[in-house]
Structure formats: C-alpha cells, structure tokens
Amino acid sequence: SGSCTTKTCWTTLPKFREIGYILKEKYNAAVQVEVVRASRLRQPTFLKIKQIKSYQKPMETDLVYIEKSPNYCEEDASTGSVGTQGRLCNRTSPNADGCDMMCCGRGYNTHQYTKVWQCNCKF
C-alpha cells in the first residue's frame, strides 16, 4: 500500500546531579588496594585489597585506590588545594556546603550583616 513506518531510538544520559551522587557514593565505598609484583617471570602483576574487613571482591564498576586522598580541609601547595579555611558555608545545610562538613570540625564564626539600598519605591 505504500505506507512507511519509521522507528527512532535514542539513549539519554542521566541528570548531572544523579551522576555526581552515584560517583560520590562509589568514592565513599572505595577500598584501598596494593600492587603485588609478580614473583615469577610471565606471572602478571595484580592488585590486592589492603585491609580485609569483610572480604568482597570489588566489581568492575567499583572504585579502588592505591594512595589515600589528601586532606581537602588543609591547604596543600603541592596540589594547589586551598583547603576550606575562610570559605563561606551554610550553617543550616547538612550537605557539603554546610559549616559542619566544610569546616572539618574546626568550628566556624557567624557574622550578621545589614544591607541598605535604594529601592526606588513610590508611595
């Protein structure tokens, strides 16, 4: 009869925030590994879990690390990290922008400001 059907398929990426959340969860659950050199010729080098809590082999999608992360709270000139000291934080937030987390237990100072400006109001 001359009719034609077109089928179009596409894949979309999840929202950036969702990806960030998943990566943060994986980062928090990452396990430390150490490189084990082969003792004999033709034997491959492999990674071994450094601390055995309840041994569970990491899956291909899990994160592992060889060296511990630096202390992001403190300034580190070698990496260019400025740390968190002196940054503004949200006193009521339980997230990364919150003072409890961002200030790394050092405590924080609160300041109250009054802002005055012309509003061009007409009465």
UniProtKB/Swiss-Prot annotation:
Molecular function GO terms recorded: cytokine activity; frizzled binding
Residue ranges of the region described as Disordered linker: 33-61
GO cellular component: extracellular space
UniProt cross-references to InterPro entries, sorted A to Z: Wnt, Wnt7, Wnt_C
Record: glycosylation sites: N90
PTM text: Palmitoleoylation is required for efficient binding to frizzled receptors. Depalmitoleoylation leads to Wnt signaling pathway inhibition.
GO BP: any one term: cell fate commitment
Subcellular location: Secreted, Extracellular space, Extracellular matrix; Secreted
Residues where lipid is bound covalently (O-palmitoleoyl serine): S1
Disulfide-linked positions: C89-C104
Major subcellular location class: secreted
Keywords: Developmental protein, Disulfide bond, Extracellular matrix, Glycoprotein, Lipoprotein, Secreted, Wnt signaling pathway
Domain of life of the organism encoding this protein: Eukaryota
Family: Belongs to the Wnt family.
Role according to the record: Ligand for members of the frizzled family of seven transmembrane receptors that functions in the canonical Wnt/beta-catenin signaling pathway. Required for normal fusion of the chorion and the allantois during placenta development. Required for central nervous system (CNS) angiogenesis and blood-brain barrier regulation.
Record protein name field: Protein Wnt-7b
Protein source organism: Meleagris gallopavo
